[in-house]
């Protein structure tokens, strides 16, 4: 019997947490995975850990350094994948940041308790907002743009954008921004840029609170709402692809100081499912809350 054609995946932000676990689950299914991270030493350590644990070869799991905020770094990775594999089947955009400074002790003490006020334990600034948008929105967008030519060579191209239920439109309180992002028919990359630029402008002018962008974590909410919107735009532009955004649930990770309720194994299983579902059974242009299609 002829050996099955190998399938290739790239996972961003993968040296720990959900990204690391996505790599483990994909590699366990025989997918050849490129694990990427900003920190080279941590990334190489992560690859060695998985190779030992899964008893897989150097060909099955590779490392490449990647900073999604740096276009040159993305180009370098795309060249590497082209040279190594000649195509790509699965792109998982997992890298992300919170865009805030958190009082970790207050979070651990109060998370999940009644009357807990997020806005009292976090600090948001223009610089943090800019970085959050750059990594959470423009990072995945540039990754998609760089890898679309290689994904087109796959017989079942997948893009899985790891998002958050915080990016659902009900959490975008600014009516103008919500109006643009909820108008799926007319949504374009340019219109998403308009929303982002307005948020940055309001941060610069100190009017974010009065413009009522979100209850808290405005940068994170808008970055993920924008990523969800871009998922719809991309799915429409490439009907032969399967492009979806997914909230993995409230997972115990370093980002939330391990205050989540789900394990990383449970969290990673939702993006992995979307990466591996048979092509005909996979919808496109959807937002999933874990394994269920949910509203944007």
From Swiss-Prot:
Induction cue: By pathogen infection. Not detected in healthy leaves.
Known EC number: 1.1.1.-, 1.1.1.208
Top-rank taxon, per record: Eukaryota
UniProt: substrate binding residues: 164
Keyword DNA repair recorded: no
Keyword NADP included in the entry's annotation: yes
GO biological process per UniProt: defense response
GO cellular component terms attached to this protein's record: cytoplasm
Name of the top EC class for this enzyme: oxidoreductase
Alphabetically ordered keywords of this record: Cytoplasm, NADP, Oxidoreductase, Plant defense
Activity dependence on pH, as recorded: Optimum pH is 9.0 for the forward reaction and 8.0 for the reverse reaction.
GO molecular function, one term: (+)-neomenthol dehydrogenase activity
SUPFAM superfamilies the UniProt entry points to: NAD(P)-binding Rossmann-fold domains
Family: Belongs to the short-chain dehydrogenases/reductases (SDR) family.
Protein name: (+)-neomenthol dehydrogenase
Species this chain originates from: Arabidopsis thaliana
């Amino acid at each position: 019997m002829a050996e099955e054609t190998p399938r290739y995946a790239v996972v961003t932000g993968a040296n720990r947490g959900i990204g690391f676990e996505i790599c483990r689950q994909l590699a366990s299914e025989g997918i050849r995975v490129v694990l990427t991270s900003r920190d080279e030493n941590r990334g190489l350590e992560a690859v060695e850990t998985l190779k030992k644990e899964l008893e897989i070869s150097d060909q099955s799991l590779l490392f490449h350094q990647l900073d999604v905020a740096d276009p040159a770094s993305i180009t370098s990775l795309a060249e590497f994948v082209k040279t190594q594999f000649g195509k790509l089947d699965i792109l998982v955009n997992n890298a992300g940041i919170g865009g805030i400074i958190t009082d970790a002790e207050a979070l651990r003490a109060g998370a999940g308790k009644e009357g807990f006020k997020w806005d009292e334990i976090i600090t948001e600034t223009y610089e943090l907002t800019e970085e959050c948008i750059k990594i959470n929105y423009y990072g995945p967008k540039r990754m998609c743009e760089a890898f679309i030519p290689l994904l087109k060579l796959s017989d079942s191209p997948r893009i899985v954008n790891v998002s958050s239920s915080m990016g659902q439109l009900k959490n975008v309180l600014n009516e103008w921004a919500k109006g643009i992002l909820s108008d799926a028919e007319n949504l374009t990359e340019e219109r998403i840029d308009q929303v982002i630029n307005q948020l940055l402008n309001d941060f610069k002018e100190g009017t974010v609170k009065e413009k009522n962008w979100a209850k808290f974590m405005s940068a994170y909410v808008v970055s993920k709402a924008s990523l969800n919107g871009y998922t719809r735009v991309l799915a429409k532009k490439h009907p032969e692809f399967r492009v979806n955004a997914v909230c993995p649930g409230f997972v115990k990770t370093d980002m939330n100081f391990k205050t989540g309720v789900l394990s990383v194994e449970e969290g990673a299983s939702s993006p992995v499912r979307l990466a591996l579902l048979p092509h005909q059974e996979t919808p496109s242009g959807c937002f999933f809350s874990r394994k269920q299609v949910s509203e944007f």
